[in-house]
Amino acid sequence: MATVEVATELGTVVTAVGPKAKDEEEEEEEEESLPPCETVRWAPVGAVAEAGPGAATFSEAAAAEEPGAAPGSPSDATVRTLRRLEAERRQLDSALLALSSHFAQVQFRLRQVVRGAPAEQQRLLRELEDFAFRGCPHVLGYEGLADPCGGDESDVLPGDRPRVRGEDQSEQEKRERLETQREKQKELILQLKTQLDDLETFAYQEGSYDSLPQSVVLERQRVIIDELIKKLDMNLNEDISSLSTEELRQRVDAAVAQIVNPVRVKEQLVEQLKTQIRDLEMFISFIQDEVGSPLQTGGHCECQASGKVGIGSTRVGGSTLPPGPGKAKAEDAKRARETGLHLMRRALAVLQIFTVSQLGCATGQIPQTLWQRSQADRDYSHLLKRLEVSVDRVKQLALRHQPHDHVITSANLQDLSLGGKDELTTVVRKELTVAVRDLLAHGLYASSSGMSLVMAPLACLLPVFSSAPETMHPWELFVKYYHAKNGRAYVESPARKLSQSFALPIMGDTAVTPKQSLLTAIHLVLTEHDPFKRSADSELKALVCMALNEQRLVSWVNLICKSGSLIEPHYQPWSYMAHTGFESALNLLSRLSSLKFSLPVDLAVRQLKNIKDAF
């Protein structure tokens, strides 16, 4: 029943309103159908239909107050109405512009959602929702905000007296309106910035914008600046707004100087120390050149050719002074001369063999035992077998005696006689070193001047061949390598001497190479054993013990094997060294590389040094 009553009331209202609206439409059509001359002129908007006595009085008073006004000029009410209409139109235009911009942003974000990746669509939809319900900003603001001092003249009635500007506005209201206007402007600026960032980001993602968006660039620059401020220990958050550009530059320079200046001071100190060390080395070299080594005694030169003075040396009273600055050139010339002599010796040997084979006058006089003995000497299998046995025995003893148990101190060595050494040291010195020595000595000989070309044709007249070439101890190979590489100059360099004097690490942080360690070891063995005239076997044993202690036996022997200037002139072509390059022996010795040894090095001269110290 209630529903029927409501429907009945609504129908009554519609029937009541319908004819009335219809009458108004008919009146408008009739007015539009009249010609323009017969249309009724409408009163201005806001004007009173009938002017009362108060209005006439006000008009007369206004005319009296404005004597210069023309009689046909529009009234103040009309002017105010036109101004209000213009203001409303501007407001509507600005609102329409803001609404259109808002719709354009919504369309732009919708396009981003459609073109975006599936993983990003949910986030873009949430951002679109927030933006759509945020509202559109008013571009020009309200009319009252645009002219805060103009007053609200639109509400003035035509019959009332116009109020003076600012009469109804206090200072507080003006300030409030200004603050409101500023807030609106800030919101507008913030929204425009956001829209600009979104547009740059979209253009950059689409590829139509080459550079990064300004927001991304500013963010990265801010990160860099924050890190620099943190590293430089600067506090600019408090007074950065009150400082000028020059003052900021000075503060940054001061902060950078606090970090850079200590580094520069250290670099200058290092350069000064390097200069002082270089000057000291030059001074030591100058003193060595001035003083020189003691003159050689005996009245003869220790050159290969007796009675001849080497290149770069000077004869003074039967003695030979050391070479001067041309020492390196003299050594190069000497090396070239030795190479030439070696080639000449080989050529002479080939010519001699050719002559003897062609003449054939002394072939019957060659003893057969000589060839048999030579063929027997060329076999090195038993030497390799002996080396393998000695390596295995040393390895077994080394594994049995752990490094912490096998430490021979000086106190224990003083109580030991030469025959009372431990078993591992004995095996290393008497078996392993001997096996290495014999294998290195296979086919090793000392280079000689050879037979003269004049004596070659007379070889057939000799009853037998000349004696075999002079043998050479393997230790002499290490000594020749030491001299060829200028080992004494390296070990006794001023820099190493200064480092030893000040207890500084000789090589610093750099690793010691096998070549440097070998030169140092040979120099140590020579300086300890030569004053006591020890044999080459003793010196080789000391070197092998030192190599085992430093785990460099394979690398040191390999350096000798790879030295062509030593191998070619001192080894026969059939020797084990020239035939195999000592490869299998190095493989056997490598079994000891992972073991740690602490063998005595100066065992052969320890008692002699103790006797010397006692006296």
UniProtKB/Swiss-Prot annotation:
Which parts of the sequence carry Phosphoserine?
A: S73, S499
Please note every region of biased composition (Acidic residues).
24-33
Q: Which UniProt keywords apply?
A: Coiled coil, Phosphoprotein
Transmembrane spans: none
Which portions of the chain have biased composition (kind: Basic and acidic residues)? 158-180
Which residue windows are coiled coil? Answer: 76-102, 163-238
Query: Gene3D superfamilies given for it?
Result: 1.20.58.900
Domain RUN, first and last residues per copy: 423-604
Q: Which GO terms describe its biological process?
A: in utero embryonic development
Q: Tell me the SMART domains matching this sequence.
A: RUN (SM00593)
Q: Where is this region: Disordered?
A: 15-41, 147-180
In terms of InterPro entries, this protein maps to: Run_dom (IPR004012), Run_dom_sf (IPR037213)
What is the recorded function of this protein according to its Swiss-Prot or TrEMBL entry? May play a role as p53/TP53 inhibitor and thus may have oncogenic activity.
- Which PANTHER family does this UniProt record tie to the protein? RUN DOMAIN-CONTAINING PROTEIN 1, SORTING NEXIN-29-RELATED
UniProt protein name? RUN domain-containing protein 1
The source organism is Mus musculus
Classification lineage: Eukaryota, Metazoa, Chordata, Craniata, Vertebrata
The coding gene here is Rundc1
